[in-house]
Amino acid sequence: MRDLRSLADDLATTIAEQFSTTLQAVDREFGVFFQRLFNGGQASLRTSDDPEEPGIDIYARPPGKRIGSLAQLSGGERALTATALLLAILRVRPAPFCVLDEVDAALDERNVGRFTQALRELTDRTQFVVITHNRATIEAADMLYGVSMDDGGVSKVISLKLADLDAERERAG
């Protein structure tokens, strides 16, 4: 029984250490991506002080604003903050792919440019599937897939590799 308690204690210590190390790394990257996406400002992650509701609190201060909760941010600011957090996690713990569904919908053209540049930084380890209607995001893609419906109600899928399109334009040009 004593060995079981010792094992459980060791496991709890290891989990706490790994959580703390990972949280610190994600927090650091979150701040970096936040500043890049907002062209300034500050963001951080902190463990909750409330023992009855443990968790992680997100603090964000876009340039020219006070630090506050996500609820105080505009739709575009929330989208960029969430994107900064996701990209920070992917930088620390890469995933083979990530699907983003219209995360750029609330972004203006300048912010879409920062968003696509940030995605591009991680494409060496993570493949992004971005569902979008935003022309600037589409133009930043390597590969496009389009879905349309014909008159008979049948969906058609088209694909286009943008590098091939650019090469074809150069030959025709």
Locate each region found by the language model.
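Terminal ABC-like ATPase head and other globular end-domains that cap long coiled-coil arms
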Residues: 1-173
